[in-house]
A protein has these predicted regions:
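N-terminal basic, low-complexity leaders that serve as flexible interaction/assembly modules and, when applicable
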Residues: 1-85, 321-335
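Intrinsically disordered, low-complexity regions
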Residues: 1-5, 110, 314
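Short, flexible, mixed-charge acidic loops at enzyme active sites
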Residues: 30-32, 81-93, 146-158
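Short, basic, glycine/proline-bearing loop/turn elements
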Residues: 32-44, 98-109, 248
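Intrinsic-disorder/low-complexity, polar/charged segments
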Residues: 39, 46, 95-100, 154-155, ...
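A short acidic, glycine/proline-enriched capping/turn motif at secondary-structure boundaries
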Residues: 72-75, 90-91, 140-142
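A gly/proline- and charged-residue-enriched helix-loop-helix capping module
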Residues: 88-126
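Active-site loop segments of alpha/beta catalytic cores
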Residues: 112-335
């Protein structure tokens, strides 16, 4: 199968496979480690365990690329905010202080995240040289949603609070961009050779605010990666057909489709970019025949363009690891 970096750089018509959250709760070997490490942030900052977890799906499935085991919220944590992962509730961020946030310095930030960079160094040494090592960040808008605590329900935010603080929001986004670029550079220096930007809450933005809060911040990160000659994949989840405008404005090397995007529409409208993912992770709860039928929709639609086989979101904790293995085999055998 194709090397991920080569596909993104050259836009060659070849294929590759990896999955978001491929190192995670669906794997029994991960759950064994997690059961002995209650603090998720501390686990992310354990270089040896982070590297071991990163390589678990590589050892199990021989997947084409590894993605470092970490979390997008490691950045707010390194910038001094309290971050806690609560079972069955997810991440809770508290005690955001704008003055403290703006007074952070690059040296302290890097020092706090040195264990992440060490994990990347360890993983790069242990990973076959033909396999890519993906690092990642959350986009500024998505991080801001968590940092300000404006998400009221699973897919809703208090947008009036955002609108009432536009000046403060702009300041936070700009400062986040600065530290995200630093985090990206440090990860690249440690050995990562592909970057993915997760804008997980882009779909909560009204269309009229996508340019300022989604397109421009993502574009700045992409431009930074371009200067380092590192390919970058963007994932603006939930923006529906605004994917087309995003692609034109941001110009990423790769674009991860979410499960609401029709593959035929994507092929017709998303030009000069390698496509990735698309299939609903819940598909893996179905029978093998149904899984293969769904996978075929994407493999057939993208058979003559650069395509990275992945999902439209991360693998879910309830996923059967054996089904993941059979899906990878189906993909590799697909003609």
């Amino acid at each position: 199968m194709g090397n991920l970096k080569e596909i993104l750089n050259s836009k060659k018509n070849c294929k590759s496979v990896w999955f978001m959250r491929q190192a995670g709760r669906y794997l029994p070997e991960f759950r064994k480690i997690r059961s002995n490490n209650n603090n998720f942030i501390e686990l992310c900052l354990n270089s040896e365990l982070s590297s071991e977890i990163t390589l678990q799906p590589i050892k199990r499935y021989n997947i084409d690329s590894a993605i470092i085991f970490s979390d997008i919220l490691i950045v707010p944590f390194a910038l001094g905010q309290d971050v806690e992962f609560i079972k069955n509730k997810g991440p809770i961020l508290s005690n955001f202080n704008l003055e403290k946030f703006l007074n952070n310095d690059r040296i302290s930030f890097t020092k706090r995240l040195n264990p992440v960079y060490k994990a990347i160094e360890l993983t790069r040494k242990r990973l076959d040289k033909e396999k890519s090592l993906i690092c990642f960040v959350g986009a500024p808008w998505t991080l801001l949603i968590y940092m300000l605590g404006v998400k009221t329900k699973k897919n809703e935010i208090n947008y009036e609070k955002i609108k009432s603080k536009r000046s403060e929001v702009k300041t936070i986004l700009n400062k986040l961009n600065e530290y995200l670029c630093l985090h990206i550079q440090n990860q690249i220096s440690a050995g990562a050779d592909v970057v993915q930007i997760f804008d997980s809450w882009a779909g909560l933005l009204p269309t009229e605010d996508l340019t300022n809060y989604c397109y421009i911040p993502n574009r700045r990160l992409v431009e930074f990666c371009n200067k380092s000659n590192i390919p970058v994949i963007c994932f603006p989840k939930g923006i529906k057909r605004n994917y087309k405008d995003f692609n034109i404005a941001v110009k990423p090397d790769g674009l991860n489709l979410d499960y609401e995007i029709d593959p035929i529409w994507a092929k017709q409208n998303l030009k000069n970019v390698s496509l990735q993912g698309g299939m609903d992770p819940k598909t893996l709860f179905l029978s093998d025949k149904e899984i293969q039928m769904n996978a075929s929709k994407y493999l057939e639609a993208f058979k003559d363009i650069p395509y990275i086989f992945n999902l439209g979101h991360g693998l879910l904790p309830e996923t059967d690891p054996d089904k993941v293995g059979r899906l990878i085999k189906f993909y590799r055998d697909y003609k």
